[in-house]
Amino acid sequence: MIGMLTGRVAALGADELVLDVSGVGYLVGAGARTLSRLEPDQDIVLHIETHVREDAFKLYGFLDDIDRAWFVHLQNIQGVGAKAAFAILDTVPVSEIANAAALGDKSTFARAKGVGPKLATRIATELKDKAPPTGRSFSIGLPVHSDDGTTGGAPVAPAGGDSLAREDAVSALVNLGYNESQARQAVAKILRDADSEAPLGDVIRLSLKELAA
């Protein structure tokens, strides 16, 4: 299986790109949000999700591994394929997806193109009590991709920092005796309304206040 590709953008399409890796062109499917951050001849690192079927071998690429993790997580739900998963990720930031999942907020998922009311309800219902994905942690420094398409050389932190902080807060509340589902909903409400950079201690304190209300 292929987990990561490093190369140069040789061509961009409506829903895919060709990545030149040492002279070999890999055709990689990608969402609109990822493609909008790329330019021809740009050197990039793509986190890859590989789908293998009897009649197809498909690569899907992401600039951030937490997006790849959510792409996989969403497709565990009946009726959600690659197209619907990309539509959700293109419409809703992963931090907002995590909040919507914890709160069972179907309206967030219904914003995605091609996701109707029934599917949005199923997604919200099935994700509500599931732990969100955190992505893979890499021991090497990867380029930092900014939204304007530029690439820096600084190492990045392990993927899914927001998800890891969320899990730490939920774990702390569970250790204090709260039900995991209640803890997830409380943390989601705080992260939705508060500064996403709020210290973990503040998130736990505000979540406790929410649970006591």
Swiss-Prot record:
Compartments where found: Cytoplasm
Any one GO biological process: DNA repair
UniProt region (Domain II), positions on chain: 64-142
Region of interest called Flexible linker, as start-end residue ranges on this chain: 143-160
Keywords: Cytoplasm, DNA damage, DNA recombination, DNA repair, DNA-binding
Membrane-traversing stretches: none
GO terms of molecular function: ATP binding; four-way junction DNA binding; four-way junction helicase activity
Keyword Iron assigned: no
Coarse class of the protein's main subcellular location: cytoplasm
HAMAP family for this protein: DNA_HJ_migration_RuvA (MF_00031)
Family: Belongs to the RuvA family.
Quaternary context: Homotetramer. Forms an RuvA(8)-RuvB(12)-Holliday junction (HJ) complex. HJ DNA is sandwiched between 2 RuvA tetramers; dsDNA enters through RuvA and exits via RuvB. An RuvB hexamer assembles on each DNA strand where it exits the tetramer. Each RuvB hexamer is contacted by two RuvA subunits (via domain III) on 2 adjacent RuvB subunits; this complex drives branch migration. In the full resolvosome a probable DNA-RuvA(4)-RuvB(12)-RuvC(2) complex forms which resolves the HJ.
Protein name: Holliday junction branch migration complex subunit RuvA
Native organism: Maricaulis maris (strain MCS10)
